A protein has these predicted regions:
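Feature targets compositionally biased, intrinsically disordered low-complexity regions
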Residues: 2, 16-17, 183, 219
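Short acidic DE-rich linear segments
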Residues: 22-24, 224-233
Length: 233
């Protein structure tokens, strides 16, 4: 069950020597079952380079799981945060609708002018960005493939009159030895659907005369998502 964070207080943050040292913030959420409000500990920034344990809690989505102290309801309560990787020099901003992303991106670039910045609106999209960058792939190419695979598989399912409908397609893994990129398709049936794409397709897009310029970093282009991919199609 999803709870709604509605108040953030007691927030502290400091920046030292090219790194963000984050302290906790207190977030007040309301239990969707009993409507009791209670406080949880949250983070403004997760520095994956400095705190592997916290990174793993995020990857497993344990960071957003809480139990209502009043009724015992298990609650998923995502909140806005930043994810930093100092080695790969990028920052992903998770915006749950309560932050000024433009100002935040500007602040990040003032401290880290060489960073790639991405803005996402969903925890699954945040995790996808992390997996893409850890695989040393271009997230713009992968996001474009997400969209193309979604469209192609959805059209095939409709042609077969299948009751299965896709919700979204996300990057799963890059299998270097097998030269393939694996995608997973979230769907209304809860089935595990995986799609293998030859790495040659990724490289062909990277070298496409029409699309290659679109896959380069551009100032102010931080929301690399479905809408961005649709505009290229």
């Amino acid at each position: 069950m999803i709870g709604a964070p509605f108040c953030i207080q007691n927030f502290e943050k400091e920046q030292r020597g090219g790194r963000i040292m984050a302290k906790t913030k207190t977030i007040t959420i309301e239990c969707p079952k009993c409507r009791e409000a209670f406080e949880i500990k949250g983070y403004d920034t997760i520095n994956a380079s400095l705190d592997e344990a916290l990174k793993e809690k995020l990857i497993k989505t344990e960071l957003f799981r809480h139990t209502c102290p009043a009724c015992g309801e298990d609650i998923s309560a995502p909140y806005s945060l930043k994810y930093q990787d100092m080695e790969k020099e990028y920052m992903v901003i998770l915006d749950m609708g309560d932050i000024d992303t433009a100002a935040m991106a500007e602040e990040v670039l003032e401290m880290f002018p060489n960073y790639r910045i991405r803005i996402v609106k969903d925890v699954m999209d945040l995790l996808e960005k992390i997996h893409i960058f850890e695989s040393n792939l271009n997230d713009k190419i992968i996001t474009y493939l997400d969209h193309k695979i979604y469209e192609d598989v959805s059209a095939k399912l409709r042609a077969e009159n299948s009751p299965i409908a896709l919700d979204k397609v996300l990057f799963g893994s890059f299998e270097f030895q097998k030269k393939k990129v694996v995608f997973g398709a979230l769907n209304n049936a809860g089935k595990q659907i995986f799609i293998d794409t030859p790495f040659a397709d990724y490289k062909a897009l990277a070298n496409s005369p029409r699309l290659a310029p679109c896959f380069k970093e551009k100032e102010g282009e931080y929301a690399i998502d479905k809408a961005w991919a649709e505009a290229l199609a």
